[in-house]
């Protein structure tokens, strides 16, 4: 069993609608806060989406992960989480964002307060991306 298979099994992860795998590890009884494990493997993307709440992303294990963000749907910025990078980052409410692992896999945690609710989640149309989005200086 590979490390990836082991983590998916041990953390009881399932496929996430935005891509990758996840499992909820904590939600308080009043839904004041929720926490999930989230994993992306090589060649997987967290599809562009946004929340109406701030989301804190925490790096746990594996390869660095890049978070791409856009406030206006035109321009974008990025930040990398990883062992020799940032350990956590806050994606502010209503910002579009997507993620990609920079290696075999990346395991992160995602904390939302008040707790996550799919009513606060918007998944962008399938081929949507910020107008000026580039990857490795190649406009896509």
Residues covered by each model-derived region:
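Non-catalytic, conserved peripheral segments adjacent to functional cores
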Residues: 1-90, 98, 103-140
């Amino acid at each position: 069993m590979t490390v990836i298979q082991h983590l998916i099994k041990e953390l009881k992860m399932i496929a996430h609608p935005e891509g990758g795998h996840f499992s909820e590890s904590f939600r308080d009884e009043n839904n004041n806060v929720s926490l999930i494990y989230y994993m992306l493997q090589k060649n997987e993307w967290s599809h562009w989406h946004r929340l109406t709440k701030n989301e804190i992303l925490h790096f746990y294990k594996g390869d660095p992960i890049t978070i791409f963000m856009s406030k206006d749907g035109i321009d974008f910025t990025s930040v990398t989480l990883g062992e020799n990078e940032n350990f956590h980052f806050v994606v502010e409410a209503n910002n579009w964002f997507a993620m990609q692992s920079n290696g075999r896999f990346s395991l992160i945690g995602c904390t939302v307060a008040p707790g996550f609710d799919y009513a606060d989640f918007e998944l962008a149309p399938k081929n949507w991306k910020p107008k000026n989005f580039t990857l490795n200086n190649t406009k896509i």
